[in-house]
């Protein structure tokens, strides 16, 4: 019995969501369709940035560029942006989405804020 390779279907998606998770240590961007099925994703660690370089705005810009290039092969043109986390790569990633030719329909901050839940970690002293 011959083994046949299953061909991956090319999705044709015009509008989707971009989730930007910007932490103090890394930036992860996931591009989905409107139902939430992932089209592409990229992270600064996966693109070769190491250590403290992962959390820079340039790394976030590069991550956004890589994730959008993969998603544009599926025909993506308009996006809703959801930003989560306190990282410094937030603005540069959003700015890169516009320069890559995507039309940004909306931007929402979905950073989870506790209603006095867990005790926060100790403050940094530099």
Swiss-Prot record:
One of its GO terms (biological process) is translation. GO terms for molecular function: rRNA binding; structural constituent of ribosome. The keyword rRNA-binding applies. Disulfide bonds: none annotated. Part of the 30S ribosomal subunit. Interacts with proteins S7 and S18. Binds to IF-3. Belongs to the universal ribosomal protein uS11 family. Located on the platform of the 30S subunit, it bridges several disparate RNA helices of the 16S rRNA. Forms part of the Shine-Dalgarno cleft in the 70S ribosome. NCBIfam families: PRK05309.1, uS11_bact. This is Small ribosomal subunit protein uS11. It comes from Treponema pallidum (strain Nichols).
């Amino acid at each position: 019995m011959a083994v046949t390779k299953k061909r991956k279907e090319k999705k044709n998606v015009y509008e989707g969501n971009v989730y930007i998770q910007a932490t103090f240590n890394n930036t992860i961007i996931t591009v989905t369709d409107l139902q939430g099925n992932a089209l592409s994703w990229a992270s600064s660690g996966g693109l070769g940035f190491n250590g403290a370089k992962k959390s820079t705005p340039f790394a976030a810009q590069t991550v956004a560029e890589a994730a959008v290039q993969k998603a544009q092969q599926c025909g993506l043109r308009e996006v809703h942006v959801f930003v989560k986390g306190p990282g410094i790569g937030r603005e540069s990633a959003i700015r890169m989405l516009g320069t890559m030719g995507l039309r940004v329909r909306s931007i929402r901050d979905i950073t989870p804020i506790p209603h006095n839940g867990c005790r926060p970690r100790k403050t940094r002293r530099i």
